[in-house]
Amino acid sequence: MIKNKKKKSYTSVYALGQYISMSAHKARRVIDQIRGRSYEEALMILELMPYRGCYPIFKLVYSAAANASHNKGLKETNLVISKAEVNQGNTVKKLKPRARGRSYPIKRSTCHITIVLEDTSLYQQYDEYLMYFKKPGCSNENKNLTCYDTYSSGGLWDKK
């Protein structure tokens, strides 16, 4: 059996929160709002959302950014939430005593949340490099990355 080895990524960091006492369904509602957004935008969204699940997720996103800046020296302005997943954890079961010697079960669900942040500065530099060679009118003699473009000349937008 051949196993795929994970490549070491130098541009991504993660934070894992286990046994967070919250339903996985309720945590997913919050996670779906921040997936794919930038780090700063996600923090603003999490601060303003009125759900109880926002605070633990806010702490995880903040922790992942601290891991990025401390462990790998990445800038927080270039970070994007590339992967955010919520898995169901253990269910804590208790008994609540009721009248006449009876008891009702109480189920307290937990979840595991993983936040992966990725640095986009490397990709932005690569995209600028590719766009430099794809645009018409660009040549290798030009040292700066400005090329002739139909939008910059005003030819396309001047006519109505």
Swiss-Prot record:
One Pfam family named in its UniProt record: Ribosomal_L22
Tree of life domain: Eukaryota
Keywords tagged on the record: Chloroplast, Plastid, Ribonucleoprotein, Ribosomal protein, RNA-binding, rRNA-binding
Major subcellular site: plastid
Protein name from the UniProt record: Large ribosomal subunit protein uL22c
UniProt similarity note: Belongs to the universal ribosomal protein uL22 family.
Cross-referenced PROSITE patterns: RIBOSOMAL_L22
HAMAP family referenced in this protein's UniProt entry, alphabetically: Ribosomal_uL22_B
Assembly description: Part of the 50S ribosomal subunit.
Subcellular location: Plastid, Chloroplast
